[in-house]
Amino acid sequence: MAFQKITVQNPIVEMDGDEMTRVIWKSIKDKLILPFLELDIKYFSLGLPHRDATDDKVTVESAEATQKYNVAIKCATITPDEARVKEFNLKSMWRSPNGTIRNILNGTVFREPIMCKNIPRLVPGWTKPICIGRHAFGDQYRATDTVIKGAGKLKLVFVPEGSDEKTEFEVYNFTGAGGVALSMYNTDESVRSFAEASMNMAFQKKWPLYLSTKNTILKKYDGRFKDIFQEVYEANWKSKYEEAGIWYEHRLIDDMVAYALKSEGGYVWACKNYDGDVQSDFLAQGFGSLGLMTSVLVCPDGKTIEAEAAHGTVTRHYRVHQKGGETSTNSIASIFAWTRGLAHRATLDNNERLLDFTEKLEAACIGAVESGKMTKDLALIIIHGSKLSREHYLNTEEFIDAVADELKARLLKAKA
């Protein structure tokens, strides 16, 4: 019986990527998305050669399209360093596309583990998921840093608009050979949006919310985050939280990391930009794998999102693939980028068939793994080292085929 394709009323923005993830991205589209959906895709290639050819304008255009259509689904991309500039003969060492997109969309990145019963956790006490919300604007990622050469005074100056009454702070008096300096910032508007997004996410999940800062050291900077979160909580969320039996609490980052390690999970953790970058990888590994993590950027308007894979472009596998060798690359996070993006499209469009499809595709991924069909990285978590043999895992395409079979079975079962 032929499957009647699901019509998706409104477009989605697709941001293609680099290396091995670009290879699996195409396979996911061809085997798990396009056979089942009638879909208008606004396509942007964020592969490094095309970013270079367009002077990185394509990255900005893709973010602007996301603002227009409200849903973007992004493949992993290369952030070039010196070696990549040489390898690709780039005009410039282009900025991280994720950083560019996040700064335009000014959102909060929420990451959450994909839990499979048969994948052991490095932190066995984590029996419930932990959703980490990373403020995706400003701080170190928008900072101006410099190398200081020689002796001299470093000053921080603020000149108010329409006034000559500048405020000047002496930061440090360099007396030796020099050193390094950094100036960074954030805005009240962005922190307020971060607070709203975090409060909303925790309320939707009916989980408590924790904000972590180091306000004992950065009394003004981190203190502002703490104050704004408290204001937003008191004004808009306190009564809702009390009714739902959940709570909001501020904690010092060091105390929060210790608490996270001994907790059972089941909460939303709001992190400043750098803390979120670091702690999301700590959580991913603790739950089992970076390849089992969802990542969604939620914008302040509440209706615009960008879903992505939380890992890199898997360069090592791509080198093997280029030589015609067999790879076993985990595509689950990339599949979940599609499902989370499409699920949001379904919610915006009130499209129940599409929402049901995304749930079945996610269940097909987890079902495949729990039935013993998985890629090498996951098999290695279960069967350590030399005990692992080729029969214990599937290659890149075999795994996507296994998910496709599982998905078709679930769709047919629902139809019957």
Swiss-Prot record:
Main subcellular location: cytoplasm
Any single Gene Ontology cellular-component annotation: mitochondrion
PROSITE patterns, per database record: IDH_IMDH
MF term (GO), any: isocitrate dehydrogenase (NADP+) activity
Binding residues annotated for Mn(2+), in chain numbering: 254, 277
UniProt keyword Nuclease, yes or no: no
Cofactor binding note: Binds 1 Mg(2+) or Mn(2+) ion per subunit.
EC number(s) stated in the UniProt entry for this protein: 1.1.1.42
Top EC group: oxidoreductase
Site (Critical for catalysis): 141, 214
Tagged with keyword Ion transport: no
Database matches in SUPFAM superfamilies: Isocitrate/Isopropylmalate dehydrogenase-like (SSF53659)
Reactions the enzyme catalyzes: D-threo-isocitrate + NADP(+) = 2-oxoglutarate + CO2 + NADPH
InterPro entries on file: IsoCit/isopropylmalate_DH_CS, Isocitrate_DH_NADP, IsoPropMal-DH-like_dom
Record GO biological process: glyoxylate cycle; isocitrate metabolic process; NADP metabolic process; tricarboxylic acid cycle
Quaternary structure, from the entry: Heterodimer.
Homology family: Belongs to the isocitrate and isopropylmalate dehydrogenases family.
Alphabetical list of PANTHER family matching this protein: ISOCITRATE DEHYDROGENASE [NADP], MITOCHONDRIAL, NADP-SPECIFIC ISOCITRATE DEHYDROGENASE
Name of the protein this chain belongs to: Isocitrate dehydrogenase [NADP]
Organism the protein comes from: Solanum tuberosum (Potato)
